[in-house]
Amino acid sequence: EAEEEVPVEAGWMAPEPRFSLRGALELFEAMLCAPLEAEPTAQERAAWEAAATRHAETLADAATYRAGALHPQLFEPRVQPRWLAPSFAAALGGGPHALLAHAEEVAAGVYAFDMLSEAFCTQLLAELARHEESGLPVVRPNTMNNYGVVLNACGFERTMDALQRDCVTPLARLLFPQQGGDADHHHTFMVQYRQGEDLGLDMHTDASDITLNVCLGKEFTGAGLTFCGLRGASTAAAAPGEQPKGERHFSYRHTHVKGRAILHCGHHRHGADDIASGERFNLIMWSKSSSYRLSQGFLARYQLRPSDRAGGAPPDPVCLSYTHDDDYEEYLELAPDKRAKRDASRRGG
């Protein structure tokens, strides 16, 4: 649940890339004929060394935490059957048809299914709470969530690798073959919402190709997940009796249930509704595919004008983003607290 990493206003102005064997060979020849690159500058070398040091420190902290973990079995590099909801484990073992039958399409391009066992959700939350109290550095998920933690920094990298490889990718490959068929890395984190902290999250798209979102608990009211349309969706006015299909048109509101997952493309606009009471924790996995990100399909999405800016049906108010839509105030008044959040996000703070 975070802002898109590619600036739309810059993306749709970019020229369409054209690839050919001749062009590739010409580039290869130019590379061979060009002088060797100069040695890195002192500034570049210092930046690389600083990044390497931070990475080594993160690995060391993760190893330190794993050595005294509350539930050591959670750090296994293989998915354990007891981690999964029985129905999901059976679907994984039943082949493609069983997997497809297990996932319910609750809205166009949005799939819900039981995934994690209640015991796994409870133990993972307990482990992450223990890490928060351990005194070790906590890596926050992104610029839009002030609370939560990146799971790799807690030592869960191999666990999440296995979860992606054995559970997420087999289903994503069936539902989203272009975006999810060849995922090769991920960014996985936990987010939390409660009164006095983050209440919800503004409308956005994710910096992912496929997003998995699983509720871990606890008790709460409100805090739904609202879906609108896809980046680059048609802005044409709907026919009589049909719903508009633009990026900023309402599609579906999901009610979170412990252990139940939502799977969708990263470019599907969505936002976390404000929590009314209690506290909600969710496991988020952003899956990314290097091959898809080099494809014309991926690049073309950011050459399109932002939805609903060139005529067509007006946006639904619930689908407006005060941090991302520069025309927000043409439709809604911007409250002072939202103005402060928008200004902070644009400053990168």
What residues fall within each predicted segment?
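Residues marking the start of alpha-helices
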Residues: 36, 111-112, 199, 271
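Short, functionally important structural connectors and interaction interfaces within domains
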Residues: 62, 66-67, 71, 76, ...
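Short, charged low-complexity intrinsically disordered segments located at boundaries
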Residues: 153-163, 197-203, 313-316
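Fe(II)/2-oxoglutarate
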Residues: 1-108, 305-349
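Alpha-helical interaction segments
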Residues: 146, 183, 194, 312, ...
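Non-heme Fe(II)/2-oxoglutarate
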Residues: 71, 75, 79, 84-182
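Catalytic core of non-heme Fe(II) oxygenases with the double-stranded beta-helix
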Residues: 173-174, 179-308
